[in-house]
Amino acid sequence: MRTQSELESLFAEKPAAPRDRGRVDLLVVRLAPGRHLTPGRIEVSREHGLSGDRWGKGWSFRRDVDRQVTLMTTSVAELVCDGQPLHLPGDNLLVNLDLSVGSVGVGTRLRAGAAVLEITRKPHLGCKKFAARFGQGALDWVNDEQGRARRLRGVNCRVVVPGEVRVGDAVEVVSR
């Protein structure tokens, strides 16, 4: 497991993610804690979030509409996973897109495939499970002030327009 300073150094070496248009690199359906599927395509709806995802089944956040779908930047997931499977953070979409506060603020709408998602006010932060999987250094890195501003842990979204999303689809800012 990497330390906070190692993660920061490695992150600084990575090319910046695009601000306006990127791609969907991975789809993750959370079946149960620690159990994930990684389909090549998925339906996204207002009623269920990602089809089959435990959000739609009323898990721990009790179907909080502001947490329907979670996104994380792929390069950050690669760093914290450190060779482990990239689905382990449990975010629904891993994207090559800058999710920082300065790039995509609350209310920003993103088109991923045919679906449109809106970034919500709910912060997406690391927790005990995140620390157990990736170490205290990773948790500190994503949750410190700078990590929160860069949204290293990702963002929570609600579904505005339902539709299909596929791995390789564009993810782009529709409105800021």
Regions found by a protein language model. Name each.
Residues 1-176:
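Metal-cofactor-dependent catalytic cores
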